[in-house]
Amino acid sequence: MQKHTPSVSCSPFPSSHKFYQQSLLFPNVRVPLRKILLTDGSGESPFNVYDTSGPYTDENVIIDITKGLPAIRIPWLSERADTESYPARLVKPEDNGFTHGKDLTPVFEKKRPILRSKNGKSITQMTYARAGIITAEMEYVAIRENEGLIEKNKQHTTSSKAFDASIPEVYTAEFVRNEIACGRAIIPQNINHPECEPMIIGRNFRVKINANIGNSAVTSSMAEEVEKMVWAIRWGADTVMDLSTGRNIHNIREWIIRNSPVPIGTVPIYQALEKVHGIAENLTWDIFRDTLIEQAEQGVDYFTIHAGLKLAFIPLTIDRTTGIVSRGGSIIAKWCLHHHKENFLYEHFDEICDIAHTYDVSLSLGDGLRPGSIADANDEAQFAELKTLGELTQIAWEKNVQTMIEGPGHVPMHKIKENMDQQLALCNEAPFYTLGPLTTDIAPGYDHITSAIGAAMIGWFGTAMLCYVTPKEHLGLPDKNDVKTGVITYKIAAHAADLAKGLPRAQLRDNTLSRARFDFRWHDQFNLSLDPDTARAFHDETMPKEAHKLAHFCSMCGPKFCSMRISHDIRDAVAIKKTRDEGMAAMAEKYQQNGDLYMKVMPSIKETVDD
């Protein structure tokens, strides 16, 4: 038993409060949004923003991670009446890496029914969409993407080149349904993760970001990983992947899922490898299949499956600078070479789809041959695998399984567009999910920046979700601070992409913050930013007093050199001059029109002399 309840970050954002937008179609659908309150007298209305933080920033909710979050989707699932509960698979010693005794992470004690589709029923969001059915989940994400508005606000958009995307001015549940039906978008929502707030991944919606967490064989605990998840979603992570590779994988994952309001993804091959003591050659389909069912019953929303790495592609990596850098890809390659057999994930892909279909788990087809250096970008191995992923996507779609495609990696800027073009062509517009890409290899410790450059570009070109990179990339396991840095960096990249592709409302936040900056409304600047805490802390390092928040300058320029203060002076001077000039012009016109009424006619000088 636990001696105490671990605490997590659960305070509201400054000058913000959570509110819930009621659906007009579904009485039991209420969509959470965050309202940022701006300075009284500013003339600005409160500003609504998309919110991923779940109940953790709702001051009216009491958080207890031993109980988990409310199961908001249970009523929706019950109304559809196409799922059933059944006895769960028993937890085995190998599920937690053979950990026992005091080293075993406590079991999450609050039990819930395990669901699966009823025999003969298809319960995926793609099935409903293709049948013309609008689900509560589809309505939920439409409201969420609109940030609660039903009409597009006017804005000044600097660019709207969306590279053949079809972005509506207002999202509707019908638009969402159509995007899912044709495979251009997914709503990753395992029926066994009812705590999850629906979100959508697709190129015609706002660009999403994923944050990776997870323990390793040498570090981290359940409390740390739950806190990392909560911390990541506070700052804007749309999904979280649990990439745990050490002990207690099963129990830690249960704690994470029960307390997560965002979709949770995994790479099942990692846990399967732990079950065979880390010996890749000992992996079997039966072990992997059992792992998929274990994770699906827990509520994992999407699986990364490295089924596109075929035996014939492995020789294509021999002359690479950095070989195979994907952990999952290297595991599969080692198994294939040892057994001289085709990838068992490729061979059993039909069965993988059947399992995913039973629980509405989305598939994220892994890029096991992604380039790990810019020298290897866009090579034959990478695109051979991508072509295979496109073929596997068609198989998944035939079974109504929602699918997205994973992408690179390390790619210099001039080669990024080709990646997007190839993916769209080979994978029939299935959502693209990329790791960066990193645009240079010379900056260990700063790869959150090298990758954000590529992420912003490929997001503009059409990538639907960006996997964050932290400063610890290539160096170590990220801690809580690294997670925040990675998430904020990728929120910037995603927002920059949304601006470039002309997403409705994207520029409104920029415009609102810019007005606050020009008006020296310091608190509004802080509160409208992605990271209010850091913005306020940087300002207060040199001007900490509350009176400084009313100053019309900061420590960068001081009062005499502040360009915005000078701009205000120029505006005031121009306004005064304009008023004065307009007054003088009006008087001149008046004199010209009626001068004879005010001026005495004087005799000429000559007439005066003659007299």
Swiss-Prot record:
Recorded hits in InterPro entries, A to Z, give:
ThiC, ThiC-associated_dom, ThiC/Bza_core_dom, ThiC/BzaA/B
Alphabetized, the UniProt keywords read: 4Fe-4S, Iron, Iron-sulfur, Lyase, Metal-binding, S-adenosyl-L-methionine, Thiamine biosynthesis, Zinc
Cofactor(s) the protein requires to work:
[4Fe-4S] cluster
The entry's free-text remark on the cofactor is: Binds 1 [4Fe-4S] cluster per subunit. The cluster is coordinated with 3 cysteines and an exchangeable S-adenosyl-L-methionine.
For this protein, the Enzyme Commission number is 4.1.99.17
Q: Which Gene3D superfamilies match?
A: 6.10.250.620, Radical SAM ThiC family, central domain (3.20.20.540)
Query: Which top class of enzyme applies to this chain?
Result: lyase
User: What name does the UniProt record give this protein?
Assistant: Phosphomethylpyrimidine synthase
